[in-house]
């Protein structure tokens, strides 16, 4: 199985998963890049997976379905183009992989991640929940939901690969360095991120550089407390403070 990012819009990635001469597309913001990829690689679209109902994630799903009407569109009931409604725990297959749907709200009140388990490990297509060195903004969800989604991700094996839908890594790492200026892993990752695409990323890597997965680290908590000017008594409070600080960070 081969997984390829296809650039779309300004900073979106549409993830294309190939098995044989069939492919899945994840979060098609627009149809043209997907269609070009399929034609160039002589592939048939087998499935479309949508994580949440924002135009830059579902915008191309309806057009793709019209072009490949035997190709199901998976998504929750608020995904207009969905032909196969999913909920937490829904399972299906693609190629030799097993797909499990997780509810990972926070960015939006209903947000799906797709966990693809293959012989080489777990691949998580996480939309706008987790970014490398960062997390999604809270729109219609809650910070408590987003924190819980991160805690669930953090219980996966450390070699799990995450496939976010945006390349925000360099900006996120600059904020992470603001929180942990002495973290050598962040400095190394930032130098690399300025030169090349960074995704996917392992959970092991994110545990070293993502402040939103490091809320129990004393240096992170202390820095957040210093910046917000108050005591933070739990991982959730540190997480919420970091999200507010990131919102204001330039």
UniProtKB/Swiss-Prot annotation:
Keywords: Hydrolase, Metal-binding, Zinc
EC class name: hydrolase
The organism's place on the tree of life at top rank: Bacteria
Residues binding Zn(2+) 2: 56-57, 128, 166
Cofactor(s), names only, from the UniProt record: Zn(2+)
Keyword Metal-binding in annotation: yes
GO MF entries: hydroxyacylglutathione hydrolase activity; metal ion binding
UniProt-listed SUPFAM superfamilies: Metallo-hydrolase/oxidoreductase
Binding site for Zn(2+) 1: 52, 54, 107, 128
InterPro entries xref list: Clx_II_MBL, Glyoxalase_II_hydrolase, HAGH_C, Hydroxyacylglutathione_Hdrlase, Metallo-B-lactamas, RibonucZ/Hydroxyglut_hydro
Catalytic activity: an S-(2-hydroxyacyl)glutathione + H2O = a 2-hydroxy carboxylate + glutathione + H(+)
PANTHER family given in the database record: HYDROXYACYLGLUTATHIONE HYDROLASE (PTHR43705), HYDROXYACYLGLUTATHIONE HYDROLASE GLOB (PTHR43705:SF1)
Function: Thiolesterase that catalyzes the hydrolysis of S-D-lactoyl-glutathione to form glutathione and D-lactic acid.
Quaternary context: Monomer.
Name of the protein: Hydroxyacylglutathione hydrolase
Originating gene: gloB
């Amino acid at each position: 199985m081969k997984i390829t990012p296809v650039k779309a819009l300004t900073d979106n990635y549409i993830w294309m998963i190939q098995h044989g001469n069939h492919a899945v597309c994840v979060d098609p913001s627009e149809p043209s890049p997907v269609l070009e990829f399929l034609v160039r690689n002589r592939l048939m679209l087998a499935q479309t997976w949508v994580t949440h109902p924002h135009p830059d994630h579902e915008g191309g799903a309806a057009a793709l379905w019209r072009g490949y009407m035997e190709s199901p569109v998976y998504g929750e009931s608020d995904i207009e183009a969905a032909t196969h409604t999913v909920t937490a725990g829904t399972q299906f297959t693609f190629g030799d992989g097993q797909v499990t749907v997780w509810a990972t709200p926070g960015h939006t009140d209903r947000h799906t991640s797709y966990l693809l388990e293959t012989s080489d490990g777990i691949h998580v297509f996480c939309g706008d929940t987790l970014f490398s060195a960062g997390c999604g903004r809270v729109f219609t969800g809650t910070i408590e939901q987003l924190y819980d989604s991160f805690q669930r991700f953090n219980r996966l094996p450390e070699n799990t690969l995450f496939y976010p839908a945006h390349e925000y890594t360099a900006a996120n790492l600059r904020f992470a360095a603001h929180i942990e200026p002495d973290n050598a892993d962040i400095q190394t990752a930032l130098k690399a991120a300025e030169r090349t695409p960074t995704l996917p990323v392992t959970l092991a890597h994110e545990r070293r550089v993502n402040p939103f997965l490091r809320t129990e680290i004393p240096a992170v908590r202390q820095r957040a407390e210093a910046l917000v000017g108050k005591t933070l008594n739990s991982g959730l409070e540190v997480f919420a403070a970091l999200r507010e600080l990131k919102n204001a960070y330039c």
